[in-house]
Amino acid sequence: MTDSAAPRLHVQALSADCAEAARRWAERLGLPLAADDEAEFAVQVGEQGLQVLQLGADSPGPVRVDFVEGASAHRRKFGGGSGQMIAKAVGVQPGIRPRVLDATAGLGRDGFVLASLGCEVTLVERQPLIAALLEDGLERARRDPDVAPIAARMRLLGGNSADLMRAWDGEAPQVVYLDPMFPHRDKSALVKKEMRLFRPLVGDDLDAPALLQAALALASHRVVVKRPRKAPIIEGPKPGYSLEGKSSRYDIYPKKALGKG
């Protein structure tokens, strides 16, 4: 991750009914619960949950995690099921739904896709605010009758992925999935909006080689790394093979074949 001055944030309740929830989030995240004219981002607590808004005249709008409606719901219903490239990359096949550790969870979009296909997914996010957005989205998803069974297959851990993988206790994940931050070329409005949130808070993953090394040591069957299509491979061992899409590429590091369980 790049080293740079942390952006200024403050927590804001969007209604009087949300004041107590805002106070709890402010305390938990160690952020001020007051207006700050110098703040670059507002962490807003409203009836629809937690969201982060970049402040200023050119704000792209709030970012939140929503597994019930919007893009995640559309992809769940119409995204191509087990024929999706991410499904092929992690090894989803008839009768095979691998246990996946998504070690760079972000807003949980890829983890949700895998859980919707039947995989048990453990998500790890090291940036506390991004993890809070993800936790809030999962909590709301668990209250929706259609999405609750999917959310039940998702478990969230906060912390440094490389450290967690090195100290892993218990049954190892069959697949470790990595999507390190990289100067993305995806021009979609949604991705650009999210990147404007992520970059100041998270930066690029300069420790991607260490992540890959820890993932290869932990995964029992394979490691999958998502990259922009023309990006170089992560420094370290070469992948066994790759799957290429229009804008993304999945580098697969196989260790042994996935079997029906």
Curated annotation (Swiss-Prot):
Enzyme Commission designation: 2.1.1.242
Catalyses which reaction(s): guanosine(1516) in 16S rRNA + S-adenosyl-L-methionine = N(2)-methylguanosine(1516) in 16S rRNA + S-adenosyl-L-homocysteine + H(+)
Major site of localization recorded for this protein: cytoplasm
One term of GO molecular function: 16S rRNA (guanine(1516)-N(2))-methyltransferase activity
Statement: the UniProt record of this protein carries the keyword Nuclease: no
Enzyme class, spelled out: transferase
Binding site for S-adenosyl-L-methionine: 109-110, 125-126, 179
UniProt-annotated location(s): Cytoplasm
A Pfam family this chain is assigned to: SAM_MT
GO CC annotation: cytoplasm
GO biological process: rRNA base methylation
Family from the record: Belongs to the methyltransferase superfamily. RsmJ family.
HAMAP family reported in the protein's UniProt record: 16SrRNA_methyltr_J (MF_01523)
PANTHER family named in the record: RIBOSOMAL RNA SMALL SUBUNIT METHYLTRANSFERASE J (PTHR36112:SF1)
General function of this protein: Specifically methylates the guanosine in position 1516 of 16S rRNA.
Annotated protein name in UniProt: Ribosomal RNA small subunit methyltransferase J
Species assigned in the record: Pseudomonas aeruginosa (strain ATCC 15692 / DSM 22644 / CIP 104116 / JCM 14847 / LMG 12228 / 1C / PRS 101 / PAO1)
